[in-house]
A protein has these predicted regions:
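Conserved nucleotide-binding/hydrolysis modules and their immediate coupling elements
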Residues: 312, 514-539, 544-550, 558
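N-terminal beta-alpha lobe that positions the nucleotide/phosphoryl donor
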Residues: 1-274, 278-302
C-alpha cells in the first residue's frame, strides 16, 4: 500500500479522497492556491503545499508545480481527482517519469480516449456501437455544415477534446449552425486548448447511461453496473442515479460487456467510465445504445455506484496502483438497492442559473439523512475561479421510490445563506412526476424548466416571521424581564411596529404587535394573521389560522433568509428614509451579471443594434454567457475590451438614449 498521497485537486473530491486515505492509514498532502488558503481540503490533509495564485491556470493546472510539491512533501503518488489535470496524458507521464505513481490509467490510455474522434474509431474496431456522425479532422465551417446536413438535423457539436459539456452545442437548423460552431470552438479552445469539434446525430429521446469499469495491471477488467445521468441542463449532469430505471437485464448485461470490451481495447487500469447514449423512444433495448466517450478518471457521480455495490472506488484505486489485483471478480459484484446523487451548487436558478459568488455565511447540510460529500463550510468564500459546487447529496434505499423520497427529504433540509443555491430547484426536480415515475431523459429539465425555476410567492407566515426576526422581536428577553410577559403598551395608541421588507426588488409592508407571551398579531400586505412562533430545536413552529408551520429563520445584519418546506426566501430591511435609488437610463446599460472575463465584443461605438442581439460574451466559472441588447438602439460607449476581467455590475456598454417621441 502507498505511504503518502498528494491530491492534485481541491473541493469535495479532495476531501473525499483524503477520508479514504485516512481510513487506510495513508498520509495525505493537499495543494492549494491563494483563494483556497483556508479551504476545507487544506484543513483535512496531514499537510498542505501552496502552488500558486488563484487562477487555475497558474495553480491546479500547473503540472510542474504539483510534481515539485509532491517531491517536497515526500509523497510517493499523486491522485488527480477529476477535472483539472486528471485526463491530461502529459501530466500522467511526467509524474510517472519523475518516479511518482499516478493514481489513474497510463498516459497512453488517456491519450487513446482523449480525442473523441480517435476513440470512436477505436471503439468501432472493438465492435462497440458508436453514434452516426463526422469524427474527422477537417474543421472548415462549410465542410462541417455539409456534414451536419448529411447526418440530418438536429445534430450535436462536440469538442474533440475534453468533456463536461464544454464546447457542446445542440443545433436544430442549418441557419443556426455557424454561430453555434464558432461558440463551441471558442469554448473548447479555452477549456482544452483545442478548438476542433466533431458532429454527431442528436438522438431525440436520449438517455445518458454510463458504465463504471475498473481494470488492474494483471489483465482483469470488471464493470460495476450502470448509472443513469439523463437529468442534465446544458449537458451538465444535475441528478444521477444507479441503477438505471427501466433497464432490462439483457441490456444491462450487453452494455456491461461492451464497456469491458472498450476498456480491454486500450489495456485499461484503474477507474473509468464508458458513457453511452440510449434511445428511449420505445423503451430501453439491447440494440439501442451507442458509445459516446470514455472518462479516464473517477466520475463526480461515483458515490451512487459505491452505494449500490458496497465498494469504495477510491480504495480500489489505491490498491490497484499499489500493484494489487482487483478486490472482486465480476461474479462477486451485485446491485443492492437504489441510490441518487444531487449536485448542490452556488447558483441562482431563478436568474438563469447564474453562478453565485460571495461568502457562504451559513450552511446546514442534512448529514443525518444522507451521505454528504462537501468541500466547503460556513465562512468560506465562493470565488469566481472554480466550479461553484457546495456539496453532493447522496441517498440510498432498498428501492427507487424510497431512495428518491429520502433525497427529496434531505434536500428540503439544506439551509445556506450568503449565496443563492439550487437546493429548491433540485427538490422540485426530485419530485417532478415524470422523473418520479422512472422516465428520465436528457430533455426533461428543459421541458419543465419554467415550473422548476419559477419564483414561489412568500407565504404570509414567512413574511411575518422575517419581519419579527429583523425587528429583533425574536431575540430572547432578559431573564425576569417583567415587560416580556405583558402585551405591548403605548399611550394613546395601539402598540404596533412597522417594517418594510425587500424580496427580489418587491417591497412588502408588515405591521405587528405583541399579544402576550410568544404571540403576535401581524398584518402582511393587508392580511391579518396571528403568529405564535415557538422554538423547536433550531426551527420555529408558527401557528397561523389554526395551522402549524415549521420554519427556519437565519438572520444577517440587515437581512434574513426564511426556509419552509424546501423553499427559501431572502428579505432585507428597506430604509424608510431612502429614496428611489434607481438611476435614470439604467435600462440603457449592459452590465456584467457576475465577475468574469470579457470573452468577445460584437459592438462598436456608433453601431446600430437590435433588441436581443448578442453584444458581448462573458466567461466565468467555466461558462459562457451571452449579453444581449435590451432594445433597438445605437452604441454610445464601449467601456471594456476583449480579455478584460470585470466585476459584477460593471458597465460594459451604453446605448444612446432613445429618441424622444413627438406627441405634438
Amino acid at each position: 500500500m502507498l505511504k503518502k498521497v498528494l491530491i492534485a485537486n481541491r473541493g469535495e473530491i479532495a476531501c473525499r479522497i483524503i477520508r479514504t486515505c485516512h481510513r487506510l492509514g495513508v498520509a495525505t498532502v493537499a495543494v492549494y492556491s491563494d483563494a483556497d488558503r483556508d479551504a476545507l481540503h487544506v484543513a483535512l490533509a496531514g499537510e498542505a503545499v501552496h502552488i500558486g495564485p488563484s487562477p487555475a491556470s497558474e495553480s491546479y493546472l500547473s503540472g510542474d508545480r504539483i510534481i515539485e510539491a509532491a517531491f517536497c512533501a515526500g509523497a510517493d503518488a499523486i491522485h488527480p481527482g477529476y477535472g483539472f489535470l486528471s485526463e491530461n496524458p502529459d501530466f500522467a507521464e511526467a509524474a510517472t517519469a519523475a518516479g511518482l505513481r499516478f493514481i489513474g490509467p497510463s498516459g497512453a490510455a488517456i491519450r487513446a480516449m482523449g480525442l473523441k474522434d480517435a476513440a470512436k474509431a477505436l471503439m468501432e474496431q472493438a465492435s462497440v456501437p458508436v453514434v452516426p456522425g463526422y469524427h474527422g479532422t477537417d474543421q472548415n465551417p462549410d465542410f462541417l455544415l455539409s456534414e451536419a446536413e448529411r447526418i440530418g438535423f438536429p445534430v450535436l457539436i462536440k469538442a474533440r477534446a475534453g468533456g463536461g459539456g464544454k464546447g457542446m452545442r445542440r443545433v436544430e437548423t442549418a441557419v443556426a449552425f455557424r454561430d453555434a460552431l464558432a461558440s463551441a470552438q471558442r469554448e473548447a479552445l479555452a477549456a482544452f486548448g483545442d478548438a476542433s469539434c466533431l458532429i454527431e446525430k442528436y438522438i431525440t429521446h436520449p438517455r445518458h447511461i454510463e458504465i463504471q469499469v475498473f481494470g488492474d495491471d494483471h489483465g482483469n477488467v470488471v464493470h460495476l453496473f450502470e448509472r443513469d445521468c439523463s437529468l442534465q441542463r446544458r449537458h451538465q449532469k444535475v441528478i444521477e442515479e444507479a441503477p438505471a430505471p427501466g433497464m432490462p437485464e439483457d441490456m444491462r448485461r450487453t452494455m456491461g460487456e461492451a464497456a469491458v470490451k472498450a476498456a480491454q481495447a486500450i489495456g485499461y487500469s484503474g477507474a473509468g467510465t464508458i458513457e453511452f447514449i440510449a434511445d428511449s423512444s420505445e423503451g430501453l433495448k439491447p440494440d439501442g445504445f451507442w458509445f459516446m466517450e470514455m472518462n479516464t478518471r473517477l466520475q463526480v457521480e461515483h458515490p451512487v455506484t459505491e452505494a449500490i455495490t458496497g465498494v469504495d472506488l477510491v480504495e480500489w484505486q489505491l490498491r490497484v496502483v499499489s500493484g494489487e489485483p482487483l478486490p472482486k471478480r465480476q461474479d462477486e459484484l451485485s446491485i443492492d438497492g437504489w441510490a441518487f446523487e444531487a449536485r448542490l451548487y452556488a447558483e441562482d436558478a431563478e436568474r438563469g442559473f447564474l453562478p453565485a459568488i460571495g461568502m457562504l455565511a451559513h450552511l446546514d447540510l442534512p448529514e443525518d439523512l444522507a451521505r454528504i460529500d462537501s468541500g466547503v463550510h460556513a465562512g468560506d468564500h465562493i470565488s469566481p475561479f472554480y466550479d461553484p459546487m457546495i456539496a453532493k447529496v447522496i441517498t440510498h434505499g432498498p428501492d427507487r421510490a424510497t431512495a428518491l423520497s429520502r433525497l427529496s427529504t434531505a434536500l428540503a433540509e439544506v439551509r445556506a445563506t450568503g449565496v443563492a443555491t439550487n437546493a429548491s430547484f433540485l427538490r422540485r426536480l426530485a419530485n417532478e412526476p415524470d422523473f418520479a415515475e422512472g422516465n428520465p431523459d436528457t430533455g426533461l429539465i428543459e421541458r419543465h424548466l419554467a415550473e422548476l425555476t419559477m419564483a414561489h410567492p412568500a407565504p404570509s407566515e414567512v413574511v411575518a416571521l422575517a419581519a419579527l426576526s429583523l425587528s429583533g422581536a425574536l431575540e430572547p428577553a432578559a431573564p425576569n424581564d417583567p415587560w416580556a410577559r405583558l402585551p405591548g403598551f403605548r399611550l394613546w395608541s395601539e402598540a404596533a411596529d412597522f417594517v418594510t421588507l425587500d424580496h427580489r426588488g418587491h417591497h412588502v409592508a408588515v405591521s405587528f404587535s405583541r399579544r402576550g407571551e410568544g404571540a403576535y398579531a401581524a398584518t402582511v400586505d393587508g392580511r391579518d394573521i396571528d403568529l405564535h412562533p415557538g422554538r423547536s430545536g433550531d426551527a420555529y413552529l408558527t401557528e397561523t389560522d389554526g395551522r402549524k408551520h415549521r420554519l427556519h429563520a437565519i438572520r444577517g445584519d440587515r437581512d434574513v433568509t426564511v426556509f419552509k418546506g424546501g423553499e427559501s426566501w431572502h428579505f432585507s430591511l428597506v430604509d424608510p428614509l431612502a429614496g428611489d435609488q434607481e438611476e435614470a437610463g439604467a435600462g440603457d446599460r449592459i452590465v456584467a451579471p457576475m465577475p468574469g472575463l470579457v470573452k468577445l465584443l460584437r459592438a462598436a461605438v456608433g453601431a446600430d443594434v437590435s433588441r436581443g442581439e448578442t453584444l458581448a460574451v462573458m466567461e466565468a466559472m467555466k461558462m459562457e454567457l451571452a449579453l444581449s441588447a435590451p432594445r433597438d438602439g445605437r452604441i454610445a460607449e464601449v467601456l471594456v475590451a476583449e480579455g478584460e476581467q470585470v466585476l459584477e455590475a460593471a458597465v460594459l456598454l451604453v446605448l444612446e438614449p432613445p429618441p424622444e417621441t413627438d406627441h405634438g
